A protein has these predicted regions:
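Glycan-recognition and catalytic cores of secretory/periplasmic carbohydrate-active enzymes
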Residues: 1-245
Length: 245
């Protein structure tokens, strides 16, 4: 049986680790968005039920998600995409309020895939204009990557990213973490973020191998649920950053 983010009563098991919530987060996000475009009430209800339970059961410190996750932000970063899709479709005003409390409760010293919560922080900033959220997102990345980075930083030291130092790390980690500075660049305009993002991509394909058609599409720029149209998609190529509408 899949572990959902929904009510543990009624047969939904409680996982002891973080990875079942990561996997169910992917599943719920995909099925909910699919339900919206197909107007499938069953799939939409799956998303709504999980979102509703998470929003109505915040922890004492304001963080969202099951207590068993502790401060693990990677699994929540995956599920947060469902929260943002739900907000985009319903404009449920609980989401910006509760996500702000969640972000405020975060430890500043997040590392590696935990930093992927930056994606949702920046997206919520785009909705609300709350500069405190954006500033904290930047602060989390700066502590993790800048000035030599943290001791447990796997391969995302700023200087190494800019210089395109070859990396040896889990593929999902490489893809998810390396896009965070690009997302920050979109909302802050800080050149050092763009330099890090572009530099980190080159080792994946080789400096002359982009003719194979590789493009990195930002998950942060997702489909607009309300307007039924495509938001601009940010693509990274050897030739720079392009926007596809």
């Amino acid at each position: 049986m899949s572990v959902e983010w929904n009510n543990p009563e009624g047969g939904n098991p409680i996982a002891k680790g973080w990875w079942p919530y990561e996997q169910s987060g992917y599943m719920i996000d995909g099925l909910y968005r699919c339900g919206i475009f197909l107007r499938d009430s069953v799939l939409m209800q799956l998303g709504s039920d999980n979102v509703g339970y998470v929003l109505s059961h915040p922890r004492a410190n304001g963080m969202l998600g099951p207590e068993t996750l502790g401060e693990n932000q990677w699994a929540f970063s995956v599920f947060a995409r469902t929260l943002l899709a739900y907000y985009d479709y319903t404009e449920d005003d609980r989401i910006p309020v509760l996500l702000k409390k969640h972000f405020s409760a975060l430890n500043d010293t997040l590392t590696n895939r935990q930093t992927c919560i930056i994606e949702s922080m920046c997206k919520m900033y785009s909705y609300t204009g709350d500069k405190e959220i954006l500033q904290k997102a930047g602060h989390i990345w700066d502590l993790f990557s800048m000035n030599g980075g943290t001791k447990d930083n796997e391969v995302f030291i700023h200087g190494d990213m800019v210089s395109s130092k070859p990396i040896d790390v889990h593929g999902v980690t490489a893809a998810e973490v390396s896009k965070q500075p690009l997302i920050l660049y979109l909302y802050t305009g800080r050149q050092e973020y763009l330099d890090a993002a572009l530099g980190s991509i080159l080792p994946w394909n080789g400096k002359t191998n982009f003719q194979m058609g590789y493009r990195l599409h930002m998950k942060a720029c997702f489909l607009s649920m309300r307007k039924r149209c495509m938001r601009p998609v940010i693509s990274v190529t050897l030739y720079g950053v392009t926007v596809t509408c």
